[in-house]
């Protein structure tokens, strides 16, 4: 066995249907007393209801979290945090809300409690992606990692089926890239395979019966594992392309992951098929084409064109993605990446 380093994320995980009733207890356990509740505008009502349940432990609600964590929104949130005299944040929602909580923590050292309502997985990573002037950058550090994550499947029962599918594929992208990361290790790989297995088991069940609590629990379990391995190893081509297109073209985050994943995995698979063999075994056939077929069965968006990307955008995106690429086991060449984007734009089966 080759030598390796595995760094575990020092977060407290509270998992179980109905567990979100313990938010107040978690705030007190941290020795805190003034929580600013965060959400997107869409989940403002849920955030206000949570703040009402917290009573005097709630310092207020900030409900303007947005995709790709725009720096201008973060500045307003930090002002609200300080004006409210808050001493922690409670992030209720998906990756956008979690990202805002991380951005506030980075600037104020605020402890974070996250209650995920999607399968994004970012709640267990020490990674923050934020956007300024149309450019998305990524930061990593222990101060970004939330202190407590509460997984309650009841809070995902209202997640629309379409978003559930793309959010789940987003989580799977984290685990898929962990299998061939430069700093991969057997512990992270084991968690990645289990996370992928859980998502592949759960998502068809969620699609067929959105109120199936058992399937929702399995999906949350898979999302936790997939997100955890993203925090334990480095990112590669897939996340680079998603960050480039998402930040530059303001594309929906999970949907971008869902569309690109089969193509990026097929690209890398040509260089390291053995490392992606566990994923190939789970989806059947080859990893890239198997993911393409799996996403199609879930009814996920099939092309970049369906997300609003124009053919005229592809040259610039290929240029940006290859100007400062993440490490990748297969050389990242502009011509090859442009061809990858073309197939993803058309929704053609990966090569």
Curated annotation (Swiss-Prot):
Its EC number is 1.3.1.32. Keywords: NAD, Oxidoreductase. Pathway: Aromatic compound metabolism. Changing residue 243 to A: Retains 0.4% of wild-type specific activity. GO terms for molecular function: alcohol dehydrogenase (NAD+) activity; maleylacetate reductase activity; metal ion binding. The keyword Nucleotide-binding does not apply. It is an enzyme of class 1 (oxidoreductase). Pfam families: ADH_Fe_C, Fe-ADH. It comes from the Bacteria. Induction: Induced in the presence of gamma-resorcylate. It catalyses: 3-oxoadipate + NAD(+) = maleylacetate + NADH + H(+). CDD domains: MAR. Belongs to the iron-containing alcohol dehydrogenase family. Each subunit consists of two domains: an N-terminal NADH-binding domain adopting an alpha/beta structure and a C-terminal functional domain adopting an alpha-helical structure. Homodimer. Involved in the gamma-resorcylate (2,6-dihydroxybenzoate) catabolism. Catalyzes the reduction of maleylacetate to 3-oxoadipate. PANTHER family: ALCOHOL DEHYDROGENASE, ALCOHOL DEHYDROGENASE 4. This is Maleylacetate reductase. The gene is graC.
């Amino acid at each position: 066995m080759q030598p390796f380093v595995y760094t575990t994320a020092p977060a407290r995980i509270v998992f179980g249907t109905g567990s979100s009733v313990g938010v107040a207890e978690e705030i007190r356990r941290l020795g805190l007393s003034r929580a600013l509740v965060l959400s997107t505008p869409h989940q403002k009502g849920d955030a206000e209801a949570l703040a009402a349940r917290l009573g005097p432990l709630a310092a207020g609600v900030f409900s303007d979290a947005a995709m790709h964590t725009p720096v201008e929104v973060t500045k307003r949130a930090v002002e609200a945090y300080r004006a409210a005299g808050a001493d922690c944040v409670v992030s209720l929602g998906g990756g956008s809300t979690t990202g805002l909580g991380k951005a506030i923590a980075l600037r104020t050292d605020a402890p974070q409690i996250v209650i995920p309502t999607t399968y994004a997985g970012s709640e267990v990573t020490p990674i923050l992606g934020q956007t300024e002037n149309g450019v998305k950058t990524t930061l990593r550090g222990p101060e970004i990692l939330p202190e407590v994550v509460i997984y309650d499947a009841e809070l995902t029962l209202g997640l629309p089926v379409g978003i559930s599918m793309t959010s789940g594929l987003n989580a799977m992208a984290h685990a898929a890239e962990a299998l061939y990361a430069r700093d991969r290790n057997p512990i992270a790989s084991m968690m990645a395979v289990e996370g992928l297995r859980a998502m592949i088991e759960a998502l068809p069940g969620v699609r067929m019966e959105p109120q199936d609590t058992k399937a929702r629990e399995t999906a949350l379990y898979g999302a936790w594992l997939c997100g955890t391995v993203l925090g334990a190893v480095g990112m590669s081509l897939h996340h680079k392309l998603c960050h480039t297109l998402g930040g530059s073209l303001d594309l929906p985050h999970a949907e971008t992951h869902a569309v690109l994943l089969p193509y990026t995995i097929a690209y890398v698979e040509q260089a390291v098929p053995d490392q992606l063999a566990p994923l190939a075994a789970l989806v059947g056939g080859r990893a890239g084409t198997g993911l393409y077929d799996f996403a199609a069965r879930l009814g996920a968006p099939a092309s970049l064109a369906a997300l609003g990307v124009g053919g005229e955008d592809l040259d610039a995106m290929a240029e940006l993605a290859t100007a400062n690429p993440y490490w990748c086991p297969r050389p990242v060449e502009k011509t090859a990446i442009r061809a990858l984007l073309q197939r993803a734009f058309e929704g053609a089966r990966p090569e």
